Swiss-Prot record:
This is (Z)-2-((N-methylformamido)methylene)-5-hydroxybutyrolactone dehydrogenase. NAD(+) binds at W149, N150, G226, G227, L249, E380. Its EC number is 1.2.1.-. Keywords: NAD, Oxidoreductase. It holds the Pfam family Aldedh. Involved in the degradation of the pyridine ring of trigonelline (TG; N-methylnicotinate) into succinate and methylamine as carbon and nitrogen sources, respectively. Catalyzes the NAD(+)-dependent oxidation of (Z)-2-((N-methylformamido)methylene)-5-hydroxybutyrolactone (MFMB) to yield (E)-2-((N-methylformamido)methylene)succinate (MFMS). The keyword GTP-binding does not apply. It comes from the Bacteria. SUPFAM superfamilies: ALDH-like. GO terms for molecular function: oxidoreductase activity, acting on the aldehyde or oxo group of donors, NAD or NADP as acceptor. Homodimer. The gene is tgnC.
Amino acid sequence: MQQFQLYINGKFEDGAAQFDSINPATGEIWAKMPEARTDQVNRAVDAAEQAFYDSSWSGLTASQRGKLLYKLADLVEKSAPRLAALETTDTGKIIRETSSQIAYVAEYYRYYAGLADKIEGSFIPVDKPDMQAWLVREPVGVVAAIVPWNSQLFLSAVKVGPALAAGCTVVLKASEEAPAPLLEFAKLIDEAGFPAGVVNVITGFGPECGAVLSAHPKVAHIAFTGGPETAKHIVRNSAENLAKVSLELGGKSPFIVFADTDINSALNAQIAAIFAATGQSCVAGSRLLIEESIKDEFLQRLAERVQSIKMGLPDDMQTEYGPLCTLKQREKIQQVVQRSVEQGAKLITGGQVCDGAGYYYPPTILDCSGVSDAQSIHTELFGPVLSVDTFSTEAEAIQKANSTPYGLASGVFTSNLTRAHRMTRAIRSGIVWLNTYRVVSPLAPFGGYGLSGHGREGGLSAALEYTTTKTVWLRMSDQPIDDPFVMR
């Protein structure tokens, strides 16, 4: 049975205790994970603070920090098979996805390596002839990066990459539900040659790990991806120290299909939007809003396509669809699906727990047309359940798309260019995908509105999240200050 360790102040160590990690494909224990408790969390933060001020890190130029990130990116690529296999075993995500996602992880680190020496200040043209002023951007300090189990390597890269590029130090908390990929990633941090304490990797449970980390007075910035309820706890914990908080939370993203679109493209994109990663994605397009005139044809073809999705063991490259991560998640999904059917939703496909080992749940489509209170329409399930509703006008599509407190992502399929522009203006979401879905790039900011959080990841915007500004004034005159009591 595999064993993993924490990484604190440049050294690997056992946790205060151990806990089991379950393989979602089999339901069996496959590894022992280290549990960090209060003392180890405190030591990780102390190490990060000490490293932040130590010349071995603070004395590096921006381009030198970039070189370390370039090396890390190369190591991620070199270790891709191992990292992908661990993520597949620990989370149940299919190897086809974890393998391809590792390439994105390397690209994000490479992008921020190149950006490190391009985080610039600016000259301020003040209206005072005897004064000059300029703006300096400085790293904010110790960053607590808290990520969920799904896509841990990717979701940590979009935090750790810009934080290190900006000159911050990091305590990275891996989800206790599947921490193996990030605990393995710590070995790459060590091999890349980052000074001790610059990046620390821990895992553990909420009360003695996450809560201690988010309330720590030495943490200057908390970057969190996860659910709104946990986010509220983090914000409350951080309030005592007024730490900066950036949140990338969940969503109930609308996937809007107009009758004038290319149906084949929309079908494939909808499959990707909700059934890729078994629906366990913050941007899952879990609400299909379909123009009424094409509903029957679209649903028939979608149901036929869903039946051909190959479910199987996640480590098989032929598998298209794997298990859910936890038994608890499967039980929640089944309860919501059953309740929605009781409320009047029509089951098109799926809806029953799969027989056999592992936490499998079939691709499920619920026709919720005319059942506006169906629970599946309003609940972020984090699973493979598509709720279908119709619209007859553009205004109705917009109203239904925005009828949620979330606002992370949306998809719009139409061949009408002016309509596409109108929809992007009207929809309240941080990302709008037009005639595509689930596309990312290191250059493009990512984030949401409302209960989907605030702050942005990706692009220059993300690096600036980890900086603070300092305004510097210089008096140019040789003349003495004549009146000290007058504001200049």
